[in-house]
Each structure stands twice: as C-alpha cells, then as structure tokens.
C-alpha cells in the first residue's frame, strides 16, 4: 500500500506539472485573505460563476480590513446571485473577527483557522497549505470522487466510517514536501479529468491502476448513504405599491435568504391558482380595502439544496397606506441598491418596468 500511495502522489504531481493547464485568478496565491475569500465563494458554487464574484470582491475590498469596514447591505448586494447567503453572513463575521481580534492577519495554525466562522476542515486545509505550505490535505467532492474510484472504495462518503476513511487516506496520500502543489493538483484533476459525469478515463494517467475503471464502476463510485429529500414551498409575493413606492422588508428570521430584502410574502401550504389565492383570508389580511390587483406573473420555480420554491408575484396598487406593518416604503429607483434573493431578481429582470 505504501508504494501505491507513493506512486499516486508522484504521478499526480507529474500530471499537474506536465499537462495541467487550468488557470484561475487565485491559483498560486499566497495571501491567506485572498485564498479564504476564494474558498468561501466557491463553496457550493461553480468556478465559472465564482470567478467574476471573486474579482469584484478583490477589487472592492483588497484587504480583510476593507471588507470588515464595509456596510453589510453593500456586501450583500455584491453577493447577490451567488446564493447560499449564510456564506455571506459568515464572510462578514470572519472579516470583522480577523480585523478586530487578529490585527488583520489570518492565523497560521490549522486549529485556529477552524474556529473562524464558516471555515471547516476543507477551507482550513486550503489556507494552511496554499498560504503557509503546511501539510494538511484538502478533502472535498473532487477528492472523494478520485479516491473512491482509484482505490475502488464502496464505503459511503457521507457515512461516519467513510469520512474517517477518506480523510485518513487523503492525508496519507498528501505529498508532505509539496502540500500546496499536491492539493492544487488533486482539485484540478477532479475538475478536469476525473469529473462527476463523462470523466476522461481513456486518457487518464491512472487508468491502468484505477479499480473503478478496471471493474466498470466509474459511474457508480463514489457511493452516498443518504438521499436528499427536498421540501416543497409555495410563495405568493405581494408587490404592493403606494404613492409610487413599494413595501419591502429585510428577512431577519433563521430561514433561507436571511438578511436579504423581499416584498410582502404569503406562504401557502399548497399551490393554488392566483385567482383563488386573492380571495383567501391570507391575502386580505396583508392588504387593505383600497387594494387593486393590477397584474400578476406566472409561477416561477427555484431549486435550492434542500428546498424547491415555487411562487408568483402579484402587483397591487393602494389608494391608502397600510397600517401597523413592519415594512418600509421604498422608491422603485432605490430597489436596485438593495440585495434581493435570486427568486425576486428574476422577476425584476422579466418585468423591468413593473
């Protein structure tokens, strides 16, 4: 097994040095702030999408101190469209923590990095190896996939036993003299060669030793123990207009889209037609007797990791203001300066003159 581990590491580094042409703006970066920022952006986000956001953030906030001092609404607006907004909340909290408690310098110790909000083992390993060249192996979906296929491991990657097994194997395989180069190589290899779908097995440097390829299990591995069950939710947004202004509020509860802005929301237990919805008590309680429905959108759908959101937008004009409500009245020209969830910005894009 020791020889197999040594050969794997050596061959992977050879591949990276000889054939790896993947370029990214943060690749080869030694600044822990920029590494951290790129890793937070890339959590649950494709590199192609994350790249432009990374460049925007670096341009606006070249240091962690600049990010820490920025207005939260401004940061959320810049994050708009990336989704998984808990990452943005963690980004803000950690930037302030580093600026205020670490004199603007990221800690070098792996255990200290793990204490930062939003930093898990993968991100801590990335910062440790790329910024400080410390021997900590990154373990993400790419690594799970490569190791499961190459070594023919059927243990579910999301099981307790599987996590221990894969983390140990990843650490054993890590080239301790070149942890930064090795970690970058295995991530690039997973993204370009050992892909989830349509992997390039015929030209892969490991196809003579890969057990999944040898046993025709490439499309089976890695194995997952749990299957994701998505919750279905139905949102009816009331785009209520009074005196050429719209009623909006910031979502503060612990739910999706926390800290983002929205119109008046009615969540229904099941989907009903809009004509039926505007006759319900739920609708009547949110508006007043002067409410006049101007128009409404078709139903939109958005897939989140654990939820499917389906909903619509109902444009309503009022002759008198709403009383005793927690909403702010904002001019339509000011809406573009606020961060809304993608579900709502899709409506803006399709209805620019609503």
Question: What do these predicted regions represent?
Answer:
Residues 1-22, 28, 191-354:
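Intrinsically disordered, low-complexity, charged terminal extensions of DNA damage-control enzymes
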Residues 2-200, 206-215, 219-220, 283, ...:
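Catalytic cores of DNA base-excision repair glycosylases
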């Amino acid at each position: 097994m020791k020889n197999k581990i040594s050969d794997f590491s050596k061959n992977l580094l050879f591949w990276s040095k000889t054939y790896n042409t993947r370029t990214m703006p943060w690749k080869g970066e030694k600044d822990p702030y920029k590494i951290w920022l790129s890793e937070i952006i890339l959590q649950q986000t494709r590199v192609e999408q994350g790249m432009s956001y990374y460049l925007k953030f670096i341009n606006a906030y070249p240091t962690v101190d600049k990010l820490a001092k920025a207005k939260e609404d401004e940061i959320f607006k810049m994050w708009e469209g990336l989704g998984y907004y808990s990452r943005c909340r963690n980004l803000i909290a950690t930037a302030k923590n580093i600026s205020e408690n670490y004199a603007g310098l990221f800690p070098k110790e792996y255990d200290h990095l793990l204490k930062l909000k939003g930093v898990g083992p993968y991100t801590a390993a990335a910062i440790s190896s790329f910024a400080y060249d410390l021997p900590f192996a990154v373990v993400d979906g790419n690594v799970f996939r490569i190791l499961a296929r190459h070594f023919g491991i059927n243990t579910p990657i999301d099981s307790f036993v599987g996590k221990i097994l894969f983390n140990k194997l990843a650490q054993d395989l890590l080239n301790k003299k070149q942890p930064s180069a090795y970690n970058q190589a295995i991530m690039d290899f997973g993204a370009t060669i050992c892909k989830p779908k349509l992997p390039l097995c015929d030209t892969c440097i490991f196809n003579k030793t890969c057990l999944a390829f040898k046993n025709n299990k490439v499309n089976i591995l890695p194995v997952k123990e749990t299957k994701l069950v998505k919750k279905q939710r139905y949102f009816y947004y009331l785009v209520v207009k009074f005196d050429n202004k719209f009623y909006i509020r910031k979502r503060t509860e612990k739910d999706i889209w926390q800290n983002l802005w929205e119109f008046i929301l009615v969540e229904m237990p099941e989907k009903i037609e809009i004509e039926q919805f505007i006759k319900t008590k739920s609708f009547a309680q949110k508006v007043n007797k002067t409410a006049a429905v101007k128009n409404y959108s078709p139903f939109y759908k958005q897939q989140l990791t654990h939820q499917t959101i389906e909903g619509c937008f109902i444009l309503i004009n009022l002759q008198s203001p709403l009383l005793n409500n927690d909403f702010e009245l904002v001019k339509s020209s000011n809406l573009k300066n606020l961060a809304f969830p993608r579900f709502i910005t899709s409506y803006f894009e399709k209805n620019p003159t609503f």
